[in-house]
């Protein structure tokens, strides 16, 4: 029997993979008449000063409003966006899903933080290994083609 998802989380960071994940999450939310939670996590370890943090915050609020407008335009009846601060792995994989009763997390195969991916593993890998709910990992055609070679 197929799952009927009620609360879907999509994590976005501005990458192509995140945009693909967003599109798939919108389709799933619409098909299931589910709530769509659009999440962006600002990794506070990457900021050197307050002014760079403030400008990033303004940019992210605008981007998140755009994502939510796209979801509404596509027919998602209940959508929200959140900007959280801290460790993306922990927030995406545990804290946010628990707080919002998420039953499906949709993420891109890779994100923008290449340094963290090299040093300590990707957020996506961590989420798929440790999350308590279903996780859908979305790959762009370029990544899928590269994996076939």
Where is each model-derived feature located?
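Hydrophobic alpha-helical membrane-association signature
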Residues: 21, 60-63, 123
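General small-molecule cofactor/ligand-binding pocket signal
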Residues: 37-39, 80-84, 136
């Amino acid at each position: 029997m197929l799952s009927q998802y009620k609360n879907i989380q999509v994590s976005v960071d501005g990458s192509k993979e995140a945009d693909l994940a967003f599109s798939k999450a919108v389709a799933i939310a619409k098909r299931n008449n589910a709530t769509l939670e659009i999440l962006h996590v600002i990794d506070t370890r990457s900021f050197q000063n307050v002014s760079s943090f403030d400008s990033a915050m303004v940019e992210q609020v605008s981007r998140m409003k755009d994502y939510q407008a796209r979801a509404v335009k596509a027919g998602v009846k209940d959508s929200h966006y959140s900007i959280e601060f801290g460790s993306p792995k922990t927030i995406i994989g545990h804290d946010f899903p628990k707080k919002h009763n998420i039953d499906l997390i949709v993420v891109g195969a890779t994100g923008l933080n290449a340094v963290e991916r090299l040093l300590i593993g990707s957020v996506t890998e961590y989420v798929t290994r440790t999350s308590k709910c279903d996780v859908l990992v979305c790959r762009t055609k370029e990544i899928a083609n590269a994996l076939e070679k």
